Amino acid sequence: TYYKGKLAAEMMNKLGYDAMTVGNHEFDDGPEVLRGFMDAVDFPVLMSNADVSGEELLAGNLAKSTVIERGGQKLGLIGLTPQDTDELASPGPNIIFTEPVNAVQGEVDKLTDMGVNKIIVLSHSGYVVDQAVAAGTTGVDVIVGGHSNTLLSNTNERAEGAYPTVVGATAIVQAYAYGKF
């Protein structure tokens, strides 16, 4: 939080990120710092499960999803933030965090109506929530998750699940921690 996201934005731009989701730590210093970070990055910042219309710094500037093209294929990316972010960080009183399953399904429906049939959720809501989202939605192909620092592996006995964990037709992977995945 010392650099208020400036160094992270520079590095992420150099790495060529396609998009990212908002996690609770993006709100550690309030919406002002998140907006500064968003202005500094060259890619969309996503959050599907929050109403930011009452926060003028974010209203109209924070997308719920985006579409990228790779190899001639359209990929829909959806952002998912912890529903309890208002308890974990400092988003201020003007942002309302909502239930993740309905938020994700709403974006899946919009993307599929646009002809997108490959949907990836970028989640910072934790492994348990990611499993619930996979079980409660249709049309999500992959969830790339973080927040809970959950180790998934097919060889490590300490792992909390298989890599990938498959729920219905959705593959779930987790970022784990310290650059490991």
Regions found by a protein language model. Give the residues of each.
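Acidic, metal/ion-coordinating pockets
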Residues: 1-181
